[in-house]
Amino acid sequence: MIPGEIMAAPGDITLNAGATPLTLTVSNTGDRPVQVGSHYHFAETNAGLSFDRDAARGMRLDIAAGTAVRFEPGQTRDITLVPFGGARKIYGFNQGIMGAL
């Protein structure tokens, strides 16, 4: 083994296995790009993004950890969200929840 080497099990890895996905259409109505990270509470994203925020409550992007999605000004795209796991408590972000979902 080489120091730092990772020996992964054979086969494919399924991200967010077992999570119930939700697809929403999101539009950037602002004049600047908006980038949203993989674990950001999507309902609390930049006000320039137009989408059903109530439906997105307690959800995050269904993308690999450490990655992000960028919305250019005027761009509309479909995104997939998955529920936060664990204790389902949200703190920080834009302080819209600050506790249990």
Curated annotation (Swiss-Prot):
Cytoplasm among the record's keywords? yes
Enzyme Commission number(s) from the entry: 3.5.1.5
The species is: Dinoroseobacter shibae (strain DSM 16493 / NCIMB 14021 / DFL 12)
The root-end lineage is:
Bacteria, Pseudomonadati, Pseudomonadota, Alphaproteobacteria, Rhodobacterales
GO CC terms for this protein?
urease complex
Q: In which pathway does it act?
A: Nitrogen metabolism; urea degradation; CO(2) and NH(3) from urea (urease route): step 1/1
Instruction: Write out the similarity annotation.
Output: Belongs to the urease beta subunit family.
Q: Which InterPro entries match?
A: Urease_beta-like (IPR002019), Urease_betasu_sf (IPR036461), Urease_subunit (IPR050069)
What keywords is this UniProt entry annotated with?
A: Cytoplasm, Hydrolase
Catalysed reaction(s) here are: urea + 2 H2O + H(+) = hydrogencarbonate + 2 NH4(+)
Top enzyme class of this protein? hydrolase
Q: List the protein's name.
A: Urease subunit beta
- Quaternary organization: Heterotrimer of UreA (gamma), UreB (beta) and UreC (alpha) subunits. Three heterotrimers associate to form the active enzyme.
Q: Does the keyword Cytoplasm apply?
A: yes
In the record, biological process GO terms are: urea catabolic process
Query: Which compartments is it annotated to reside in?
Result: Cytoplasm
* Record Pfam families: Urease_beta
State the gene name recorded for this protein. Answer: ureB
The GO terms describing molecular function are:
urease activity
